[in-house]
Amino acid sequence: MKALSKLKPEEGIWMVDAPKPEMGHNDLLIKIRKTAICGTDVHIYNWDEWSQKTIPVPMIAGHEYVGEVVDVGQEVRGFSIGDRVSGEGHITCGHCRNCRAGRTHLCRNTSGVGVNRDGAFAEYLVLPAFNAFKIPADIPDDLAAIFDPFGNAVHTALSFDLVGEDVLITGAGPIGIMAAAVCKHVGARHVVITDVNEYRLDLARKMGATRAVNVATENLKDVMKELGMTEGFDVGLEMSGVPSAFHAMLDTMNHGGKIAMLGIPGGEMAIDWSKIIFKGLIIKGIYGREMFETWYKMASLIQSGLDLSPIITHHFSIDDFQKGFDAMRSGQSGKVILNWD
């Protein structure tokens, strides 16, 4: 089968002819229809420091996808051949304390599809049936293919009450932009998103952000005055991993504010803890999606009218995968879809 593999420990990703994966009694065999390129895939392509420490070589990459079930393990219940599915990319152990307590998103032994094991950039993917999620008929393939990053946005955004609240999002990557759309959809008052990439800020405006702020040219506190905000943001969603962005968030949070952190800093990050202490801030780390509450919320949000379509900006045939990676690496894109049909 065709597959995109991290074949060598250097920059790049390569089309290979890989053996069709073998499935176990509890697995599904999924024929991939569409995949999306994640920022993680770009890290793997670039072969940066994180990738060098994390990624086994060779390995088929990719973890954002939609496909069709074409075979079902003999112990599997609840899935049938022909089901349209995406899936949770965090394969959990099932036996640690958190797994046994039903908090599987906090499994300490997680293995990542397309990160620690072969992934979805292939004609076929084997996935434990536990991890699969049936896609409702009224959700198109393009949106189903980005459920993984959409789930990061939903998990982060819905960590705290948003109704009538003022929200600051630092980092206008696709996940931050989708989080802005979620916040507005569920009833936040002002949703302000910051970045220095004007292309991405324009996308955030299309997706409903109250204000998309280029911090290279605008002062965040001036924007707050413009919006009539007198006390600070109630909720912060840190999506960038950039220290200066987090520092700006701490400076502009209201007392008693709540911060959810998804962005991963490139190294250790010094912060002024006195601001957190004296403001009484609550900080929550976010990793992945809650299994499977976040997934049901994702489907329901789309079915209730949340429009994510502007975030998908490019489509390519899998044979043109290099063009897709070039678009993602340029920073001048939203989500990039690779078609496998």
Curated annotation (Swiss-Prot):
The organism of origin for this protein: Shewanella frigidimarina (strain NCIMB 400)
Keywords: Cytoplasm, Metal-binding, NAD, Oxidoreductase, Zinc
Known cofactor(s): Zn(2+)
Cofactor descriptive note: Binds 2 Zn(2+) ions per subunit.
EC identifiers of the protein: 1.1.1.103
Alphabetical list of InterPro entries matching this protein: ADH-like_C, ADH-like_N, ADH_Zn_CS, GroES-like_sf, L-Threonine_3-DHase, NAD(P)-bd_dom_sf, PKS_ER, Zn_alcohol_dh
Residues annotated for NAD(+) binding in this entry: 175, 195, 200, 262-264, 286-287
Residues at the catalytic site: 40 (charge relay system), 43 (charge relay system)
GO cellular component: a single term: cytoplasm
Pathway: Amino-acid degradation; L-threonine degradation via oxydo-reductase pathway; glycine from L-threonine: step 1/2
Record bears the keyword rRNA processing: no
Underlying gene: tdh
Example GO biological process: L-threonine catabolic process to glycine
Protein name from the UniProt record: L-threonine 3-dehydrogenase
Protein family (similarity comment): Belongs to the zinc-containing alcohol dehydrogenase family.
Pfam families in alphabetical order: ADH_N, ADH_zinc_N
Recorded superkingdom: Bacteria
Binding site for Zn(2+) 2: 93, 96, 99, 107
Site (Important for catalytic activity for the proton relay mechanism but does not participate directly in the coordination of zinc atom): 148
Binding residue positions for Zn(2+) 1: 38, 63-64
Primary location recorded for the protein, binned into one broad class: cytoplasm
Annotated GO MF terms: L-threonine 3-dehydrogenase activity; zinc ion binding
Function: Catalyzes the NAD(+)-dependent oxidation of L-threonine to 2-amino-3-ketobutyrate.
Protein's UniProt keywords contain Transmembrane: no
